[in-house]
């Protein structure tokens, strides 16, 4: 992958890539311009586009930029935590920086309504919508994967969501005829890596070690391990 945010560079780079992951984490006026130019180029080439609306709801600039991107570009996938996705769906919301607001969390108690919400937003946005958290939801508007892989400790490592967005872009690009399943598989793989990584932690290990354990688990994971370890149902 190449991470480019120079407006004069992004069209050339986008042309040689199979997919584009637009992550608004490091937002500024130059990167906003680059995002739109790269997105327009990717759309013209029929490439996979993924939007990661990092921190949408935390500031007016982030919210407005994410909404504008969603309205002007034909995203294949939109991935975020529940607060970020609610911000896009409703046009406003609240997050705690890059973290979801506790009151928004998907749980067994509100699962039915959360699934209905994600399906509705996927239909309206014409995109696969992936909501990640303690319980992950991935929907194309018709079906919804409810995924239960992962560890709560993953939430203490900054960047796991961004890492997942990169993986998801690659999974969807590699499986053009099964995009929903590919997006769900990426979520399962990331969560499973968190489980495997945590099982290999030793006394005295901390976040830095855990981050690397997750990366190692992803690197060493194959299809058989993913099939065996994935925890999901389809609604």
Language-model regions, residue ranges each:
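Short, well-structured alpha-helical segments that form the helix of a local strand-helix-strand
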Residues: 117-122, 179-194, 211-215
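Conserved phosphate/ATP/ADP-binding segment of small-molecule kinases
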Residues: 63-144
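Short pre-catalytic strand/loop immediately N-terminal to key active-site residues, enriched for Gly-Thr
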Residues: 147-159
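Short, small-residue alpha-helix embedded
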Residues: 156-188
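Charged C-terminal helix
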Residues: 192-235
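Glycine/small-residue-rich loop that forms an oxyanion/phosphate-binding "nest" at active or ligand-binding sites
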Residues: 31-80
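Active-site cofactor/substrate anionic-group-binding motifs, chiefly glycine-
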Residues: 1-45
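Hydrophobic beta-strand scaffold residues
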Residues: 1, 49-50, 129
């Amino acid at each position: 992958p190449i991470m480019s945010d120079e407006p004069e560079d992004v069209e050339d780079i986008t042309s040689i890539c199979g997919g584009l992951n637009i992550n608004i984490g490091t937002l500024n006026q130059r990167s906003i311009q680059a995002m739109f130019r790269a997105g327009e180029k990717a759309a013209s080439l029929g490439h996979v586009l993924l939007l990661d609306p990092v921190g949408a709801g935390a500031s007016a600039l982030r919210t407005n930029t994410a909404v504008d991107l969603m309205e002007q570009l034909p995203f294949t996938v939109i991935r975020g935590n529940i607060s970020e996705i609610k911000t896009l769906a409703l046009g406003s919301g609240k997050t705690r920086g890059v973290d979801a607001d506790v009151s928004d969390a998907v749980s067994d108690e509100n699962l039915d309504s959360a699934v209905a919400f994600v399906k509705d937003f996927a239909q309206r946005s014409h995109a696969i919508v992936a909501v990640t958290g303690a319980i992950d939801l991935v929907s194309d508007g018709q079906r919804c994967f409810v995924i239960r892989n992962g560890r709560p400790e993953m939430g203490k490592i900054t960047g796991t969501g961004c890492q997942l967005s990169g993986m998801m872009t690659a999974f969807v690009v590699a499986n053009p005829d099964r995009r929903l399943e590919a997006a769900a598989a990426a979520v399962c793989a990331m969560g499973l890596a968190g489980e495997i990584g945590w099982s290999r932690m030793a006394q005295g290990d901390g976040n830095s070690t855990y981050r690397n354990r997750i990366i190692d688990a992803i690197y060493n994971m194959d299809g058989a391990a993913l099939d065996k370890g994935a925890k999901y149902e389809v609604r």
